[in-house]
Regions:
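Ferredoxin-reductase
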Residues: 2-90, 148-150, 178
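FNR/FR-type flavoprotein reductase catalytic core
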Residues: 4-5, 78-213
């Protein structure tokens, strides 16, 4: 961390995408049209608004994306309620990055990777997944096990089905908690699905999500 990470920068929320009923993805740029700072996969940043408050959020976009920065945020409190109510063009402040991030250039390099996520827990992992996709030659097979309450609650579902599922060397396993009309995939909780899949224990595992503490 250096002194620059402590200084809030004014940014513009240029786009807001509704991912699920309670998750939106916010795209930000400086007033000059640039990313506010560089980051590593897995790092986070503080977003604040005077008179409302501030909160720490995972940076969802990959560092390889040089055009903008994104945050996928679940509505679950004062700051997130306010964020979910704003419109594109709103200015906020951001500072960071914070955290160590994932060791993508050391421990993960050359390894077979297993990502396990539940609900909004995919948001912090999306950054490193897309980083590994960009530098595909540096990593082995990539397995992704992801689940949520329903199909409607699967974050980044379009990106998963349109991009991740179609790439060689990437295996995606989706599940939802309960039967749902129109869903022909796996049904069940993520921890149980992982046990069914019986993944190779030699894989390097990256995991995020409250429902996964019993794995």
């Amino acid at each position: 961390m250096n002194s620059e990470t402590l200084i809030p920068q004014v940014v513009v929320v240029t786009d807001i995408m509704k991912d699920t009923p309670d998750v939106k993805t916010f795209r930000i740029l400086t007033p000059e049209g640039k990313k506010p700072f560089d980051h590593m996969p897995g790092q986070c940043a503080m977003i604040s608004m005077p008179g409302v408050g501030e909160a720490l959020f995972s940076i969802t976009s990959s560092p390889t994306n040089t055009e903008f920065m994104e945050f996928s945020i679940k509505k679950c409190g004062c700051v997130t309620d306010w964020l979910h109510a704003i419109e594109p063009g709103q200015q906020v402040t951001v500072r960071g990055p914070y955290g160590n991030g994932f060791p993508v250039e050391t421990e993960l390099k050359g390894k077979d990777l297993l990502f396990i996520a539940g609900g909004i827990g995919l948001a912090p992992l999306r950054s490193v997944i897309n980083y590994c996709r960009h530098y595909r030659e540096n990593y082995g097979t990539i397995d992704i096990v992801y689940g949520s309450r329903s199909k409607d609650d699967l974050v980044d579902y379009q990106e998963i089905t349109d991009e991740w599922c179609r790439e060689d060397g990437i295996n995606v396993y989706l599940t939802i908690d309960r039967e749902q009309e129109g869903w022909d995939g796996h049904v069940g909780f993520v921890p149980n699905y992982v046990k069914e899949l019986n993944p190779d224990v030699s894989k390097t595992v990256l995991m995020c999500g409250l429902s996964l503490i019993h794995i």
